[in-house]
Structures are given as structure tokens and as C-alpha cells.
Amino acid sequence: MIIGVLSVQGGFVEHMRSIERLGHEARAVRRAEQLEGLDGLIMPGGESTTMSKLLELGGMLEPLRELIADGLPVFGTCAGLILLADRVLDTRSDAHSLHAMDITVRRNAFGRQVDSFETQLPFGDIDTPVEAVFIRAPKVEEVGDGVEVVSTLPDGTVVGVRQGNVLGCSFHPELSEDDRVHEYFLRMVKQRGVE
């Protein structure tokens, strides 16, 4: 199984390490031609507006939209979640979205860098809570009918969503040694018949 990790900006190295710890090949994706032959793609955290501009400059927005529409499993964390959302609050007018999930997200909803926190949360069908690191994280304010909520904070704030082949979370699972959220994504990839 080959999992691409978008590597134009942000925390891509940690995601690659998680995939490799789980026994699969991780490929850094910086150009559109590197999207070919992938079984899945991770879009990491970073700065969402910067990432969207780099994707535009690199000619990757349309190829990504097409691959997602064709069913490529994609997992976005933090800024990656923002890029996947249909609607983004508190963003710049020149930011781009892939419009891959029927959700509304608010950028930096949990405050500034000093407001970062760690907690344990339920996630999908994982049997015990996962480690979740929140750094200037977005939150999901609205979900469409076809979106499954897979993780919430104790107060009900939505921080994990899935819509078909697209998975997203507000937090950074790659910053812990707990690889179970990545395993969850790999199970999505395997559901497409990929080993």
C-alpha cells in the first residue's frame, strides 16, 4: 500500500513516520505527477491559506479534486481538514478549498498557540480513546446529511468527520505515538480493495 503525504508545507514528516511504523510505504507528494499510483493521501496540518496557495501554484488543486471525486481515500488533519471543507469561516478571500466534505469549519477555533492542549477522545469504532493534540485547531460547526461524526469533545464539539472516502479531524494524531487514527484511515483504504 502506498500512502501519499502532501508535503508542500506543514507537519508531513510525522505523518510519514506513522504510516511507515504501520508497515506501509509513505510517499512525499510535492507535485501533481506524484499523485499517480497512490492508494490514499494524507493532508497534514500547517497553515491552510499558505497550503492552498502552494497547491494552486503547483497545479495540484484540480488533480486533487478529481482524485477525491474518483474515490481516492483522503485524510486531512487540522489545516488538511480546512482544505477539505466546503465552507470555511474566518479565512482569507484568496484561500482555496477542495470542497470534498459537506461541512463548515472555523479556523483557529480553539484560540492561539498558547491555547494548545492534549486530551483523549473517542474516534470512530476504535475501542479506547485516542491521543489528540490540538494546536490552533479548527472546529466543525456544521455537518451535512452525508457526513458521519466520528469524534467529539466532551462538550459535543465536533472534531472528527467522515464522508465516504474522506476523513478529517481537527487535531494532530501524528504528534503522538498512538497510530490508531492512521490505522483507521488505512482500513478505509483497504475497504477499496487495496492491500
Curated annotation (Swiss-Prot):
Belongs to the glutaminase PdxT/SNO family. HAMAP family: PdxT (MF_01615). It catalyses: aldehydo-D-ribose 5-phosphate + D-glyceraldehyde 3-phosphate + L-glutamine = pyridoxal 5'-phosphate + L-glutamate + phosphate + 3 H2O + H(+); L-glutamine + H2O = L-glutamate + NH4(+). The keyword S-adenosyl-L-methionine does not apply. CDD domains: GATase1_PB. Catalyzes the hydrolysis of glutamine to glutamate and ammonia as part of the biosynthesis of pyridoxal 5'-phosphate. The resulting ammonia molecule is channeled to the active site of PdxS. The keyword 4Fe-4S does not apply. The gene is pdxT. Its EC number is 4.3.3.6, 3.5.1.2. In the presence of PdxS, forms a dodecamer of heterodimers. Only shows activity in the heterodimer. Pathway: Cofactor biosynthesis; pyridoxal 5'-phosphate biosynthesis. Gene3D superfamilies: 3.40.50.880. L-glutamine binds at residues 46-48, 107, 135-136. It comes from Corynebacterium jeikeium (strain K411). GO terms for molecular function: glutaminase activity; pyridoxal 5'-phosphate synthase (glutamine hydrolysing) activity. GO terms for cellular component: cytosol; glutaminase complex. One of its GO terms (biological process) is pyridoxal phosphate biosynthetic process. This is Pyridoxal 5'-phosphate synthase subunit PdxT. Keywords: Glutamine amidotransferase, Hydrolase, Lyase, Pyridoxal phosphate. The active site is at residues 78, 172, 174. The lineage of its organism: Bacteria, Bacillati, Actinomycetota, Actinomycetes, Mycobacteriales.
